[in-house]
């Protein structure tokens, strides 16, 4: 039974000692480029070298004000120093201090048991 789904050149049997690379009708080999696996750092370095001098980098991009506004942490700092958070922290510290007399002079330590 003849397989008609494959192209004519792939129907030829491959001998055990031959290369798996195909030869075209003229007898020259079609070479596949050797692929090397590059790390991300090597690919970035190669890309930087390839585009060096071809990509203009502006001195300013016109949106620096937005960047500075985004980096402003004053709204977050105000939320973290609110009186509610400070009073909650003080209440937790007071709760832990109330039981210290019942346990002795040493505070209770958290015990972590191995699950292995």
From Swiss-Prot:
GO BP annotations, alphabetical order: blue light signaling pathway
**Phenotype when inactivated?**
No visible phenotype. Bic1 and bic2 double mutants have a blue light-hypersensitive short-hypocotyl phenotype and an increased anthocyanin accumulation when grown in continuous blue light.
Q: What main location does UniProt list?
A: nucleus
Task: Kindly list the GO CC terms recorded for this protein.
Answer: nucleus
Q: Which UniProt keywords apply?
A: Nucleus
Q: Which domain of life is it from?
A: Eukaryota
* Start and end residues of each stretch annotated as Disordered: 1-33, 95-116
Check the record and name the InterPro entries matching this protein.
BIC
Report the subcellular localization: Nucleus
This chain's function reads: Regulates the blue-light dependent dimerization of CRY2 and formation of photobodies. Inhibits CRY phosphorylation.
PANTHER family of this UniProt entry? PROTEIN BIC1 (PTHR34207), PROTEIN BIC2 (PTHR34207:SF17)
Q: What is this protein called?
A: Protein BIC2
Q: Which organism is it from?
A: Arabidopsis thaliana
| Primary gene name | BIC2
């Amino acid at each position: 039974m003849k397989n008609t789904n494959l192209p004519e050149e792939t129907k030829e049997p491959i001998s055990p000692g031959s290369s798996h690379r195909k030869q075209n009708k003229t007898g020259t080999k079609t070479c596949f480029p050797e692929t090397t696996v590059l790390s991300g750092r090597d690919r970035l370095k190669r890309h930087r070298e390839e585009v060096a001098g071809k990509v203009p980098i502006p001195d300013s991009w016109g949106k620096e004000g937005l960047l500075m506004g985004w980096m402003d942490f004053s709204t977050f700092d105000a939320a973290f120093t609110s009186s509610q958070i400070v009073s909650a922290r003080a209440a937790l510290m007071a709760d832990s201090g109330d039981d210290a007399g019942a346990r002795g002079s040493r505070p209770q330590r958290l015990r972590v048991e191995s699950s292995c």
